[in-house]
């Protein structure tokens, strides 16, 4: 489990074996570890050679809002998205709709603008936030800052899908 880009050698080996067996490979990543340096890029290119599809999480298009939500910049995910576009790798974008964090129209419009600039996006998934994992945080003794956050209404989900639909196929 966890972020596959932190385990690139293992995932590359696993995907290589899967491809030999004719199994389709999909990498599900938030791309937080993605870097432009030559060493990382070399490893990443090896992984992409055996990856059929990338499921890329873009938590927030605004850098400060992304940092507030995740603790890190969104520059890595956006850079990865641009690079994946440059190599023609098929990508499905996944955007978790968190009320009060990732559901404002201005940010959704900006995300749609960014995604429209890419030619490799095959699908955009709007994933409504839920609190099903709250118990895990409690068991770990870690404060869950989204514990009081309610799932988005169907109206907000439909709104996000409508805005993002101009950038591609939305589900």
What are these regions (language model features)?
Residues 113-116, 122, 138-163:
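A structural motif corresponding to the C-terminal lobe/cap of the Radical SAM core domain
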Residues 1:
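Glycine/small-residue-rich loop that forms an oxyanion/phosphate-binding "nest" at active or ligand-binding sites
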Residues 4-127, 132:
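Conserved AdoMet/S-adenosylmethionine-binding subsite of the radical SAM
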Residues 90-91, 155-171:
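C-terminal accessory region of radical SAM enzymes
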Residues 71, 138-141, 168:
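Glycine-centered secondary-structure boundary/capping sites
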């Amino acid at each position: 489990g966890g972020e596959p880009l932190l385990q690139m050698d293992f995932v590359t080996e696993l995907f290589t074996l899967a491809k030999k067996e004719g199994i389709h490979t999909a990498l599900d990543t938030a791309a937080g570890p993605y870097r432009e340096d030559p060493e990382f890029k070399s490893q990443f290119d090896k992984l992409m050679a055996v990856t059929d599809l990338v499921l890329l999480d873009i938590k927030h298009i605004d850098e400060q809002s992304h940092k507030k939500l995740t603790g890190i910049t969104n520059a890595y995910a956006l850079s990865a998205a641009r690079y994946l576009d440059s190599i023609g790798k098929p990508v499905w974008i996944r955007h978790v709709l968190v009320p009060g964090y990732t559901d404002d129209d201005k940010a959704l419009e900006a995300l749609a603008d960014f995604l429209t600039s890419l030619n490799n996006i095959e699908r955009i998934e709007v994933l409504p936030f839920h609190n099903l994992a709250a118990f895990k945080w409690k068991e770990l003794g870690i404060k869950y800052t989204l514990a009081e956050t309610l799932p988005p209404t169907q109206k907000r989900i439909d709104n996000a899908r409508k805005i993002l639909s101009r950038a591609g196929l939305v589900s």
